[in-house]
Design a protein with these regions (language model features):
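Carbohydrate-binding surface patches
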Residues: 568-605, 611-614, 652-658
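Conserved, mostly hydrophobic/aromatic
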Residues: 53, 150, 244, 311, ...
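Catalytic-core region of carbohydrate-active enzymes that cleave or remodel glycosidic bonds
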Residues: 401-404, 408-411, 429-432, 438-553, ...
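Bacterial N-terminal signal peptides
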Residues: 11-23
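Active-site cleft segment of glycoside hydrolase catalytic domains centered on the general acid/base Glu
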Residues: 173-177, 186-188, 221-223, 227-231, ...
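Extracellular and organelle-lumenal recognition/adhesion modules and their flexible linkers in secreted
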Residues: 27-299, 317, 332-342, 349, ...
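Bacterial N-terminal signal peptides that target proteins for export
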Residues: 2-13
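Solvent-exposed strand-to-loop "edge" motifs in beta-rich extracellular domains
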Residues: 151-155, 192-194, 552, 587-589, ...
Length: 662
């Protein structure tokens, strides 16, 4: 009996060991999934602006970032007028042991009344020097050219020398302005750098005794996007361009609201001559105790004209957001009285004229004078940013009455508050349905699990009601506003799963954008962010690449697909009626590979399938300056001769199949 039991046990053990690899493989690869795509019954059209971008000046995204001015506080208009400017006290650059002098700020007989402050350096001895520290340093590339300029007035010294020094104090570039007189004039010279510095300084030296007056001191790269004199930083715009975004929402965000109405964003102060654009404190100056930024202001070198121009450059529809008479409801919640809204409504009407009006109109003429006689083709405006409640609705009605009467062609985007659920959200949606609003902006900064479990969020939205703008969203690895949030593969792939739901419901969801877009690695206030940069370099995060592969592979019509979301598999399908391609997106949120078969009804393709894959077996994987494409798209192909296409989905992967559909 014992012997029989031992022999039986040995036989079962051998059988178990023989079958173990097959069992493990079956569990590891999971059951083969069938992805059924019915091309014979195409659904609704998808908005051509489905996946876009949202730019807000947070994390030093504008000054110190997309707008590549290297001099901080160039017009001396910060609350502390000498912010960013320093004498050589306790600091010695090579050859700059500065003789005595002093810096003072004045307002008599200014360059203009909009920005009245200017600097008066006085040299007691020849060789007096002072410097600007830039935006967490001044970054310059060896061999590159930079335009050094300033408005100068002087009855004394006739020259001003400029040197750029690296982190060790070594001079890596120099130039000189000269020929001053006692009237304000702009002078410039081009400086070629002979070495690279990530955190350099701009030093200014007066070689004669006496004083001179300085304003709008600038060090600006010559090589900008499209080589414009007041252009944008090339590498950052290239990353935006590569997204092929359907729209550009600007300039915010909470900076539209301001802490107080006096510090709200006013678009009219951001156009025209750059030296006359009124400097303003940034809303994110001191929002978070853990990331204070007392030197965070807005010069508006990047203003509404430049935003419209950027949208045009990258092929995106412009979506400006305007203050509706309400300051940030998380701060002062200050509200303009209903009988004081004329100024706010006038701003909206004048903006339409600035963007679309004839050159014979006042604001259309300004657009033409700035170099763009053709209209910018504005089709939509946001009324308020992240507002909610009865006061908001009252003010929206005033805007809507005026705008719809004069410009019925302009769609109005309204807010549903800052959160994706709860009483304020539900109340706002009920109101917007009653008022037949055009587009409702929803925001969600939630956990990765929330994104995974909400892929069907829009499956049951009313198809006859307002359209949806998923205006701000990002998976938070720790929690909203946490300084410990990461841009890792887990956040990115969860967003991808959610985006399949946006795409499948493209008849309701008209637009979607990740937020925030940009962050300076040394000057951020908010994590996570799609693109990180320093003074010289930049890279896209895994979240950026998810946005890219979706925006670059969106069709023109929804195609029914099953399963939509089951067992860690999330899918969507679209047809591009222009290229005659069927695009199938499959997200495998599983640590194991998964076999699948794409079964097509309505077409029998033959030819080459283009495959784009984003994948990492490590959910904590991130990109970095040293490894900017650690998680990034890979391309491959697959030949097919039928409508039954076997595929293999990698662990934790986003895979896109572009299938011939002639």
């Amino acid at each position: 009996m014992v012997a029989i039991l031992m022999r039986t046990t040995t036989w079962f053990a051998a059988l178990f060991l023989a079958l173990l690899p097959a069992c493990l493989f079956s569990q590891g690869s999971q059951d083969a999934a069938v992805i059924s795509v019915d091309v014979s019954h195409p659904g609704a059209a998808i908005s051509s602006s489905m996946f876009g971008i949202f730019f807000e000046d947070i994390n030093f995204g504008a000054d110190g970032g997309l707008y590549p001015e290297l001099v901080k506080n160039r017009s001396f208009e910060f609350q502390e007028p000498l912010t960013g400017w320093h004498e050589f006290l306790g600091y010695s650059a090579k050859g700059l042991d500065s003789p005595k002098g002093e810096l003072s700020v004045h307002t008599e007989a200014p360059l203009n009344q909009t920005n009245p402050h200017y600097l008066r350096p006085h040299a007691y001895e020849p060789g007096y020097a002072f410097f600007n520290s830039g935006f967490r340093g001044i970054g310059v590339e060896g061999g590159a050219e930079y335009r050094f300029s300033a408005y100068v007035r002087s009855a004394g010294p006739k020259t001003l020398r400029a040197t750029i020094t690296d982190e060790s104090g070594h001079e890596i570039g120099s130039g000189k302005l000269e020929g001053f007189d006692d009237h304000w004039k702009r002078y410039e010279t081009v400086i070629r750098m002979n070495a690279t510095a990530q955190h350099g300084r701009l030093n200014l030296i007066i070689d004669e005794r006496g004083s001179l007056d300085l304003d709008m001191v600038s060090l600006f790269p010559v090589d900008t996007w499209k080589h414009r004199p007041n252009g944008l930083r090339k590498d950052l715009v290239q990353l935006l361009y590569d997204l092929h975004p359907g729209f550009l929402r600007f300039p915010g965000g909470c900076i539209v609201e301001g802490r107080l109405l006096t510090t709200r964003y006013r678009w009219k102060n951001t156009v025209g001559d750059i030296e006359k654009r009124q400097t303003l404190i940034n809303r994110w100056n001191d929002e978070f105790d853990q990331r204070p930024a007392s030197d965070y202001f807005q010069s508006f070198g990047l203003g509404f004209f430049e935003y419209f121009q950027l949208a045009e450059d990258i092929g995106a529809k412009p979506l400006p957001i305007l203050n509706c008479g309400m300051a940030c409801q998380f701060n002062s919640s200050e509200t303009a009285a209903l009988n004081q809204l004329d100024e706010y409504v006038r701003d909206a009407l004048d903006l339409i004229e600035f963007a679309n009006g004839p050159v014979t109109s006042p604001w259309g003429k300004l657009r033409a004078d700035m170099g763009h006689a053709e209209p910018f083709h504005l089709t939509m405006i946001g009324v308020g940013n992240e507002q909610w409640g009865p006061r908001y609705v009252e003010r929206y009605k005033v805007f809507a009455a005026a705008l719809k009467a004069q410009h019925p062609e302009i769609k109005l985007v309204v807010a549903a508050g800052p959160f994706p659920t709860g009483e304020p959200f539900d109340s706002m949606w009920s109101t917007w349905r009653q008022l037949h609003a055009d587009i409702v902006d929803e925001h969600y900064y939630m956990s990765p699990d929330w994104f995974l479990t909400n892929t069907g969020r829009y499956d049951h939205y009313d198809r006859s009601g307002p359209k949806v703008f998923a205006g701000e969203y990002a998976a938070q690895s720790v929690g909203a506003t946490s300084a410990e949030n990461r841009n890792n593969w887990k956040t990115a792939i969860s967003e991808a799963a959610f985006m399949t739901g946006l795409e499948r419901n493209g008849d309701v969801v008209q637009m979607a954008s990740y937020a925030p877009l940009l962050a300076h690695v040394d000057a951020w206030q908010w994590k996570p962010d799609a693109i990180w940069f320093d003074n010289l370099r930049s890279y896209g995060t895994p979240d950026y690449y998810v946005q890219k592969v979706f925006a670059n592979n969106v069709g023109t019509r929804i195609i029914p697909v099953t399963p939509e979301a089951v067992g860690g598999l999330y899918t969507s399908a679209t047809l591009d009626e222009n290229t005659h391609e069927l695009t199938v997106k499959a997200i495998n949120y599983s640590p194991s590979a998964r076999g699948a078969e794409i079964r097509l009804t309505g077409i029998n393709p033959s030819g080459t399938i283009k495959i784009i894959t984003l994948a990492s077996a490590d959910l904590n994987a991130e990109n970095s300056f040293d490894h900017p494409t650690a998680v990034s798209p890979e391309s491959s192909t697959l030949e097919t001769k039928s409508g039954n296409i076997p595929v293999q989905l990698r662990p934790y992967s986003v895979t896109i199949y572009r299938i011939p559909a002639e």
